[in-house]
């Protein structure tokens, strides 16, 4: 299996160039569902140790339906197939440039949740124009074991998020374990209370926000992912959901740019324009760097060919 690895603000992306499962034709949403239904062993073996690493997201290249798109892509982590991935789209774009498949300029990429526009400014810098993002619930309160009542918004930016501001725990690198435990407890309570999207879509991400000590930065975030890891980047789909909340509250004007910081200090530049359906069209600028190009082997006599699972699944 031929892969290229990159990181976007510290968050790794593995682009699968060849050797992945054949998913047939049809809409990318159907092919993504087929990947989730029939090929869980594939994406877990690619993402889990010893081949993968915590927080890595995979990007399986597929043929797009729309001929104007440079490629189709299905994102996944070790736990689930994702509708969209912002840091992964930045990493994918830089990877395609590294391969010589695209040059600086604007391109379209097809994802299971819609077509995303990317603008490659230089070898490492990409601006994404994401799908329309929206807030669907404001100030929903849940009782969380160990924390009491916690209030958050439910918003969609390509994935579903429960957004808590301010964070119940200071967002510092030294608090990552405590932040993760808190986010897991909150997500468990959110699911137990039946809180989800408009049609009951499950919340699989939790984001905490707080003010940043850096004067040029709007806020600092901690993003808890479906597989129990945390996002090293500010999270593209999470930032999109955040923009929808800020716009709905009247706290950020259309076209106004802010800087969003992750728990490790990496940043995105964010802005939005009004969307046609009452949401926002986010713009996210970040940087990615290619780290490795390699061939993955899956020998039948390897006891860990399907990855190392540290907890029962």
Curated annotation (Swiss-Prot):
Residues covered by region (Disordered): 1-23
Molecular function in Gene Ontology: 4-hydroxyproline epimerase activity
SUPFAM superfamilies: Diaminopimelate epimerase-like
EC number in record: 5.1.1.8
Active site residues of this protein: 85 (proton acceptor), 235 (proton donor)
Keyword Ribonucleoprotein part of the UniProt annotation: no
Swiss-Prot/TrEMBL keywords: Isomerase, Plasmid
Pfam family of the protein (one): Pro_racemase
InterPro entries: Pro_racemase_fam
Residues that coordinate or bind substrate: 86-87, 205, 231, 236-237
The keyword Nucleotide-binding is annotated on this UniProt entry: no
Catalysed reaction, written as an equation: trans-4-hydroxy-L-proline = cis-4-hydroxy-D-proline
Top-rank EC class of the record's enzyme: isomerase
Family: Belongs to the proline racemase family.
Function: Catalyzes the epimerization of trans-4-hydroxy-L-proline (t4LHyp) to cis-4-hydroxy-D-proline (c4DHyp). Is likely involved in a degradation pathway that converts t4LHyp to alpha-ketoglutarate. Displays no proline racemase activity.
Protein name as annotated: 4-hydroxyproline 2-epimerase
Organism: Ruegeria pomeroyi (strain ATCC 700808 / DSM 15171 / DSS-3) (Silicibacter pomeroyi)
């Amino acid at each position: 299996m031929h892969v290229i690895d990159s990181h976007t603000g510290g968050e790794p992306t593995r682009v699968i160039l060849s050797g992945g499962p054949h998913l047939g034709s049809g809409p990318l949403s159907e092919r993504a569902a087929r990947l989730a239904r029939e090929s869980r062993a594939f994406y877990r073996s690619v993402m889990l140790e010893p081949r993968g690493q915590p927080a890595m997201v995979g990007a399986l290249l597929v043929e797009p339906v729309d001929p104007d798109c440079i490629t189709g892509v299905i994102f996944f982590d070790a736990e689930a197939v994702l509708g969209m991935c912002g840091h992964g789209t930045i990493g994918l774009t830089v990877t395609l440039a590294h391969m010589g498949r695209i040059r600086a300029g604007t391109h379209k990429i097809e994802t299971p949740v819609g077509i995303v526009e990317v603008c490659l400014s230089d070898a490492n810098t990409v601006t994404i124009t994401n799908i329309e993002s929206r807030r669907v619930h404001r100030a929903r309160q849940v009782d969380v074991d160990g924390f009491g009542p916690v209030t958050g918004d439910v918003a969609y930016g390509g994935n579903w998020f429960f957004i808590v501001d301010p964070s119940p725990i200071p967002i510092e690198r030294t608090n990552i374990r405590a932040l993760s435990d808190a986010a897991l407890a909150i997500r468990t309570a959110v699911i137990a209370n039946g809180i989800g999207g408009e049609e009951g879509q499950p919340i699989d991400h939790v984001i905490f926000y707080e003010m940043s000590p850096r004067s040029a930065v709007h806020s600092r975030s901690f993003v808890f992912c479906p597989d129990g890891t945390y996002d090293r980047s500010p999270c593209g789909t999470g930032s999109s959901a955040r923009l929808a909340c800020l716009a709905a509250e009247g706290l950020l004007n259309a076209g106004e740019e802010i800087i969003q910081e992750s728990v490790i200090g990496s940043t995105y530049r964010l802005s939005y324009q009004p969307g046609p359906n009452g949401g926002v069209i986010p713009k996210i600028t970040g940087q990615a760097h290619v780290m490795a190009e390699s061939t993955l082997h899956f020998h039948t006599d390897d006891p860990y060919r399907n990855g190392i699972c540290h907890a029962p699944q």
